[in-house]
Swiss-Prot record:
<dbReference type="Pfam" id="PF00025">
    <property type="entry name" value="Arf"/>
</dbReference>
<keyword id="KW-0342">GTP-binding</keyword>
<dbReference type="GO" id="GO:0003924">
    <property type="term" value="F:GTPase activity"/>
</dbReference>
<dbReference type="InterPro" id="IPR027417">
    <property type="entry name" value="P-loop_NTPase"/>
</dbReference>
<feature type="lipid moiety-binding region" description="N-myristoyl glycine">
    <location>
        <position position="2"/>
    </location>
</feature>
<dbReference type="GO" id="GO:0006886">
    <property type="term" value="P:intracellular protein transport"/>
</dbReference>
<protein>
    <recommendedName>
        <fullName>ADP-ribosylation factor-like protein 11</fullName>
    </recommendedName>
</protein>
<dbReference type="GO" id="GO:0005737">
    <property type="term" value="C:cytoplasm"/>
</dbReference>
<dbReference type="GO" id="GO:0005525">
    <property type="term" value="F:GTP binding"/>
</dbReference>
<dbReference type="InterPro" id="IPR006689">
    <property type="entry name" value="Small_GTPase_ARF/SAR"/>
</dbReference>
<keyword id="KW-0519">Myristate</keyword>
<keyword id="KW-0449">Lipoprotein</keyword>
<dbReference type="InterPro" id="IPR005225">
    <property type="entry name" value="Small_GTP-bd"/>
</dbReference>
<keyword id="KW-0547">Nucleotide-binding</keyword>
<dbReference type="GO" id="GO:0016192">
    <property type="term" value="P:vesicle-mediated transport"/>
</dbReference>
<comment type="similarity">
    <text>Belongs to the small GTPase superfamily. Arf family.</text>
</comment>
<dbReference type="GO" id="GO:0002244">
    <property type="term" value="P:hematopoietic progenitor cell differentiation"/>
</dbReference>
Amino acid sequence: MGSVNSRGHKAEAQVVMMGLDSAGKTTLLYKLKGHQLVETLPTVGFNVEPLKAPGHVSLTLWDVGGQAPLRASWKDYLEGTDILVYVLDSTDEARLPESAAELTEVLNDPNMAGVPFLVLANKQEAPDALPLLKIRNRLSLERFQDHCWELRGCSALTGEGLPEALQSLWSLLKSRSCMCLQARAHGAERGDSKRS
């Protein structure tokens, strides 16, 4: 999905944003769009918005509801995903195991093979927010060796960390494009006719 520019980098990309309920996904979506804080209700289904990222990349960002009954449908949004953004509430240590399990399930889906992901530890402005190193360890992010990934702290409330999150999306998208081009080149060397 998406188009590639002359440098081999995607000019358009599909970004799926997932995470448990109350992580702040919808608030982040609209803050990334440059809006003031908006009052949100729990997302039933999805929200979709276009977004510009560094490098003149047009993103289509899908914000998928995170309540437990809706998670069974998450797999329906994964086909054609270029980048996954996984949002968690960094003040809710009790739900980190549940969040880790859901992230693992998403990344184990066949549609997610090699798809890079960005974990956004939201609500970092709160005094009880967990440090990123603790979140990284609790999610065991190092085990996802078949994916490029980044972990960023942010605040949908203050906007802190969101410019860096957009830069991370661009970096991960470039890594995905490079991996696809390398796979094609490697396939051509072997005489493989498959296309990535």
